[in-house]
Amino acid sequence: MADKKTVTPEEKKLVAEKHVDELVQKALVALEEMRKLNQEQVDYIVAKASVAALDAHGELALHAFEETGRGVFEDKATKNLFACEHVVNNMRHTKTVGVIEEDDVTGLTLIAEPVGVVCGITPTTNPTSTAIFKSLISLKTRNPIVFAFHPSAQESSAHAARIVRDAAIAAGAPENCVQWITQPSMEATSALMNHEGVATILATGGNAMVKAAYSCGKPALGVGAGNVPAYVEKSANIRQAAHDIVMSKSFDNGMVCASEQAVIIDKEIYDEFVAEFKSYHTYFVNKKEKALLEEFCFGVKANSKNCAGAKLNADIVGKPATWIAEQAGFTVPEGTNILAAECKEVGENEPLTREKLSPVIAVLKSESREDGITKARQMVEFNGLGHSAAIHTADEELTKEFGKAVKAIRVICNSPSTFGGIGDVYNAFLPSLTLGCGSYGRNSVGDNVSAINLLNIKKVGRRRNNMQWMKLPSKTYFERDSIQYLQKCRDVERVMIVTDHAMVELGFLDRIIEQLDLRRNKVVYQIFADVEPDPDITTVNRGTEIMRAFKPDTIIALGGGSPMDAAKVMWLFYEQPEVDFRDLVQKFMDIRKRAFKFPLLGKKTKFIAIPTTSGTGSEVTPFAVISDKANNRKYPIADYSLTPTVAIVDPALVLTVPGFVAADTGMDVLTHATEAYVSQMASDYTDGLALQAIKLVFENLESSVKNADFHSREKMHNASTIAGMAFANAFLGISHSMAHKIGAQFHTIHGRTNAILLPYVIRYNGTRPAKTATWPKYNYYRADEKYQDIARMLGLPASTPEEGVESYAKAVYELGERIGIQMNFRDQGIDEKEWKEHSRELAFLAYEDQCSPANPRLPMVDHMQEIIEDAYYGYKERPGRRK
């Protein structure tokens, strides 16, 4: 008779790979068929499959028990019931097909798709329940699954999978929706995990298997080992805690990975707890028996030289306590549920503090709460990172402290950890037989694995516009002599007036004090009149210190933009002293989503803004410009918390403003309105304000400068505030960005700087750009058309957008000339060489300015440098190229 042919390892590998490839190819066909199923069909299939498994839960438990020789039949039946009942009930209403969620407000639509062919790895500890669980969550998500069962539980696992598969096919699932390797081997399992047709690996098993799954170069839902401590703190319900731990540890002879591996007991209740523990047939081994138990379970004795390399004897997994004791060499009373061994510490020197997957538990005494938490933490970190930890206590705060201290994904409070860990019995954890350990356990999932983990959720995002706003002072008073409101304003007793020397010398401060003195109540006031043009942060800090000492209930900012800007930041520092100036000046894309959140103001004081120039609009805006003169920087600060409480726009306060000041501030108004009108953030609400302000400027500025008549001064004062209302909500653009930086470097007058730059900016923004802004409010580039609208309103030639742009730029330049402004920087006394040397730096700084993001087109540094260099000579001499 011929000798039987020996199969080489290579031949064995090829056979395994061929078998696996056939399974995966069938699964891929099934996947396409499963994609066609609707939600109703899927739910029907899952329901029928779960009922079939439920009907066979007892015979499957018996099969698993007989095949593996491990665990407890009744408990295996319970685990099968759990997989069929709790898991299915939890995902019963979960949508897993097609559109699963639509939100008309956010514009998001979520679409669920299967991940693809699933490789299912199952352990010997829970063979049938895990096969049922993974099959059902795969069917729920329309994923075909191919199993590699543990060799020692191949037949019972296949029995469970077959029942689910046959019921699913009968209910409408495609053939080969559930398959398995028929001849288990390491080669076959490896081939399955590494097959290119497998989309993901759902692995439950030992650390080596999970590590292998993660090394396959594809998404894996692998879960790690546990080493679960149960800390019984002195305030715990002792009888309940002992009952729960015995029930949990003895369940299926301790084979659930979430079962307790050590109980840590406060010294104050140690004896009482041990007595209660013993009443449930827990046997405490003596010193000699402990050594025998260690030797049998791990092949080492406590504190021996080779403790570090101790390995669990796989023979003990799921075996009864009586059998383990007998095999170890000692006897215990019949009916013993658990073997308990008192240990002195957690770690390598005490091998019984390792995971044991059997009815063997370590018992440790804790000297204090801190010691109890430390020992629990050490248990988790001793080859059980991320899995589970339990605490029994009546102290809610201690539970939180414990949860923070231990590196466990599941912290189970006052419950048996076996059932607490798998979820949905004693707590609201997701019901699962695959428990993720997060990054602590080097897992990709940090929760109980469920159907949702086997879905690709596609998001369809509809285009949306952010909710816009109009935020202004709660009250704005205007008309001549409207400062009389100060007589009637409520709750005014301690007033700090922030102003400058000019307001004192011109008598405006006295007029404000006069109104306060006419109140029925006595008003105490503090004056800070040291605000300089372009106020420095040091000035703001000095004013804030005075404010803190005085403790006002009302702040009055009197003057032009400088006193109002300085007063706003003093207000902020006074009410919120912990604020850092560097945080305030950071740039943002969306004022509502900025990295630094400004605190709300107004709890201590109200803020009343009274402008005495017609330019900044600061009385109604959330902006302030503060200088850092030591570093030649100007910082525009923006947040709606800086919006004044009340604005008083009294034209009687601007009648004596010199003509050259009226000219400069008037052109600032025009720049505000123009930039707000074409801003990315412009809206129907701001456009009307901006257009009216532009109209008022062109109709009244020249007369206001040359004649200083009441009518034109009043209209320009109104135009300033109206433009402020517009740009407070639409923001500004690069004319202001460049003006801020040029002013900081060369100390030019702000309004005049804007006047010189504005014609260039109009032509720049009026050209269709190659590079548009990111996420503007408009749906197509329309700045050129909006300039055309302005030109038409002013009666300028504007038959095309291009003509309107040129007409408006020219009109702005000519208006500046008519009111006496030298419309170039050369005539502002700036050296040409120095100007050119700084042009690049100024362009970079302007790009970083807070006004730049709202410019209608994305401002490029090179382009702004070119504008700055051309503006030295003026629009008439060098209008610049269309960019």
UniProtKB/Swiss-Prot annotation:
Effect of deleting the gene: Disruption mutant produces significantly less acetaldehyde and NADH after ethanol treatment. Significantly lower H(2)O(2) levels after ethanol treatment. Decreases intracellular pneumolysin Ply level, but no effect on choline binding protein CbpA, surface adhesin A PsaA, or pyruvate oxidase SpxB. Mutant releases 1.59-fold lower level of Ply into culture supernatant. Significantly lower hemolytic activity in vitro. Attenuates virulence in CD-1 / ICR strain mouse intranasal infection model. Significantly decreases cytokine levels, e.g.
Top-level taxon in the UniProt lineage: Bacteria
Coiled coil: none
Binding site for NAD(+) 1: 121-126, 206, 224, 355, 435
SUPFAM superfamilies assigned: ALDH-like (SSF53720), Dehydroquinate synthase-like (SSF56796)
Region feature Aldehyde dehydrogenase, mapped onto this chain: 13-456
PANTHER family xref list: ALCOHOL DEHYDROGENASE, HYDROXYACID-OXOACID TRANSHYDROGENASE, MITOCHONDRIAL
Family to which this protein belongs: In the N-terminal section; belongs to the aldehyde dehydrogenase family.
Keyword Transport: no
Record: residues binding Fe cation: 668, 672, 736, 750
Domain characteristics, as noted in the entry: Contains an N-terminal aldehyde dehydrogenase (ALDH) domain and a C-terminal iron-dependent alcohol dehydrogenase (ADH) domain, interconnected by a short linker.
Induction, per UniProt: Up-regulated by ethanol at both the mRNA and protein levels.
Cofactor: Fe(2+)
Name of the protein: Aldehyde-alcohol dehydrogenase
One Pfam short name: ADH_Fe_C
Function, in words: Has alcohol dehydrogenase activity. Has aldehyde dehydrogenase activity. Plays a role in enhancing virulence in mice, under ethanol stress conditions, perhaps by inducing expression of pneumolysin (Ply) and increasing production of hydrogen peroxide H(2)O(2). May be considered a potential virulence factor.
E.C. numbers: 1.1.1.1, 1.2.1.3
Gene transcribed to yield this protein: adhE
Alphabetical UniProt keywords: Iron, Metal-binding, Multifunctional enzyme, NAD, Oxidoreductase, Virulence
Entry binding sites for NAD(+): 438-443
Reactions the enzyme catalyzes: an aldehyde + NAD(+) + H2O = a carboxylate + NADH + 2 H(+); ethanol + NAD(+) = acetaldehyde + NADH + H(+)
Residues annotated for NAD(+) 2 binding in this entry: 500, 534, 561-565, 612-613, 625, 634, 653
Gene3D superfamilies per the UniProt record, alphabetical: 3.40.50.1970, Aldehyde Dehydrogenase, Chain A, domain 1, Aldehyde Dehydrogenase, Chain A, domain 2, Dehydroquinate synthase-like - alpha domain
Entry's Gene Ontology molecular function annotations: acetaldehyde dehydrogenase (acetylating) activity; aldehyde dehydrogenase (NAD+) activity; ethanol dehydrogenase (NAD+) activity; metal ion binding
Positions of the catalytic residues: 257
CDD domains listed in its UniProt record: AAD_C, ALDH_F20_ACDH
